[in-house]
């Protein structure tokens, strides 16, 4: 008989023996990559190493605005140089024309440049404006010119009037010839020319007037010189000085001696010559007579733009003009080219039936560059006798232009003809004349490399006779 199956054991299984082994440690991290050396200049500016992504929003705005302003300035300056070069090429053929007088006994054509300090500023501003826009075209034409510069209001008026009075005195032969008087520099030059038989230029000369303020003085000087008297009017007798009390003089005589001695020791500073007073006024034009020898056509003239505005609140206007100097260069170049080519026309006039009889005729001379008066400082329009400049004998800038019909019809204005306009429009300025320093340097470097690589000069062996 088989043995019975033993019953299953009900006792719990024995627990496994505890292990004393520990798990292995994790592998060490890889060594960090070596950082790129940082530019110290960028680090001081707060710029780390440039990442491989677009800059932030603020940086994008900054670079966009900076690039736009830089591009606008570069484009405007390049086009300004292009416009000036175009008008230079339009008149440069005049410099190549041969002189008709082979003996040199005829004076060349000479222009007169009138410029003065703009209201509220100095003369240097007008000189810089002339050098930047007017001089390049004049220099390319090969013409000669002279300057009339005014530092004070009325200086140009006085020079223009005195020159015309000198011409009238020569017609009437009423200029006093004092044998004991020393001749001036201009008179010595004129005497030398007469002795050598040098003739004056008989063609069209020309006057270039820069700025509305100078144009007003120029017109005032024309009327004073052609219509005014040849002798200065008598000045009113000055009032006798009132004597000071004797007691006050005795009490301060001992105290003022040291001050008087100091004043005598100091060298007196040279003073400017006084400005000549005008010989007539605008109300005298109608009652004055015009000399019968006055030419039917006066010397042609042209006013040149000189936009000049001051003040912090006018910054937007100044910024617009700063980015649009190319149009200013084109307008001034056109006017100066007309002067060089000696093409002129009559000044126009309009009739206004609604205006009073005295102002029914509007002359073009009075409207030239009238918009520039809006840019003048407010203090120019304040005519205060207490603060007025004692050296200025007449206020011309703030007064309206008064024209006499006899002179208005004789005046001529320089202007280009349609034929000249068509000829100038076909002028193409090469890029090499207007490009900047960076682009020009790159172009020269490329040309130099191309010549070195492909345009090698062939060396020709010398013969013995060439060496000897």
UniProtKB/Swiss-Prot annotation:
Domain of life the protein comes from: Eukaryota
GO cellular component: cytoplasm; intracellular membrane-bounded organelle; membrane; mitochondrial inner membrane
Record's compositionally biased regions (Polar residues): 279-289
Ranges annotated as spanning the membrane: 59-75
Biased composition (Pro residues): 1-15, 22-34, 235-244
Topology, Mitochondrial intermembrane side: 76-468
Biased composition (Basic and acidic residues): 254-269
Bilayer topology: Single-pass membrane protein
Annotated SUPFAM superfamilies: Formin homology 2 domain (FH2 domain) (SSF101447)
Cysteine pairings via disulfide bonds: none
Entries under InterPro entries matching the protein: Lipid_Phosphate_FormReg, Mt_import_IM_translocase_Tim54
Location of the protein in the cell: Mitochondrion inner membrane
Residue numbers on the Mitochondrial matrix membrane side: 53-58
Keywords: Membrane, Mitochondrion, Mitochondrion inner membrane, Protein transport, Transit peptide, Translocation, Transmembrane, Transmembrane helix, Transport
Pfam family, one: Tim54
Region (Disordered): 1-34, 233-291
Protein's name in the database: Mitochondrial import inner membrane translocase subunit tim54
Organism: Neurospora crassa (strain ATCC 24698 / 74-OR23-1A / CBS 708.71 / DSM 1257 / FGSC 987)
